[in-house]
């Protein structure tokens, strides 16, 4: 049990960081397509730590703080996903299709908690972003890659050993 949790935490951190980078890249692309500055998402990430001042403060500070905050949260969400998945059946853990569904739902749950619960109290400027777009981005560009990376990792672990060759 402890070994399974330890492995799930490790897989979760790795998958969370990779999915977090993918999500950040898509947030940047989305910002540009909507006519906003490319690094506006990084400023938003930084505002979790620095408050509203990150939106107009020095860009260098926002880049460093925003990147660290975003990756730290991505790793934490990855750990939560990994620990949740540790309780699922091997069939579900290794199925790309099932994991895709679970991952998208997880991404939507992350969006809901972050935007509809926490942001309403602590970060009201987050609510100025298009919420449907944010929900889709969290599901498709964080939750989905997180789940598929996790499933690929589980498939490697649970793959049958190759048959021994006879001479």
Predicted regions and their residues:
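Internal alpha-helical transmembrane segments of multi-pass membrane proteins
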Residues: 10-12, 86-109
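Non-cytosolic membrane-interface motifs at loop->transmembrane helix junctions
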Residues: 124-137
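N-terminal signal-anchor transmembrane alpha helix
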Residues: 2-35
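Short, charged juxtamembrane terminal tails flanking transmembrane helices
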Residues: 1-6, 154-167
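Hydrophobic alpha-helical transmembrane segments
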Residues: 63-85
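Hydrophobic cores of alpha-helical transmembrane segments in multi-pass inner/ER membrane proteins
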Residues: 76-79, 138-151
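Membrane-interface interhelical connector segments
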Residues: 34-59
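Transmembrane alpha-helical segments of integral membrane proteins
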Residues: 83, 111-124
């Amino acid at each position: 049990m402890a070994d399974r949790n330890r492995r799930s935490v490790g897989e979760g951190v790795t998958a969370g960081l990779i999915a977090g980078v993918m999500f950040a890249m898509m947030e940047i692309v989305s910002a540009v397509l909507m006519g906003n500055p490319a690094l506006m998402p990084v400023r938003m990430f930084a505002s979790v730590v620095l408050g509203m001042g990150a939106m107009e403060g020095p860009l260098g500070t926002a880049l460093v703080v925003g990147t660290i905050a975003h990756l730290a949260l991505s790793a934490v969400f990855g750990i939560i996903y990994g620990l949740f998945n540790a309780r699922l059946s091997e069939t579900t853990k290794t199925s790309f299709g099932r994991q895709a569904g679970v991952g998208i739902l997880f991404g939507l749950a992350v969006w809901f908690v972050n935007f509809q619960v926490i942001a309403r109290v602590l970060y009201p400027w987050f609510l100025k972003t298009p919420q449907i777009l944010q929900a889709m981005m969290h599901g498709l560009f964080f939750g989905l890659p997180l789940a598929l990376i996790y499933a690929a990792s589980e498939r490697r672990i649970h793959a049958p050993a190759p048959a021994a060759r006879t001479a």
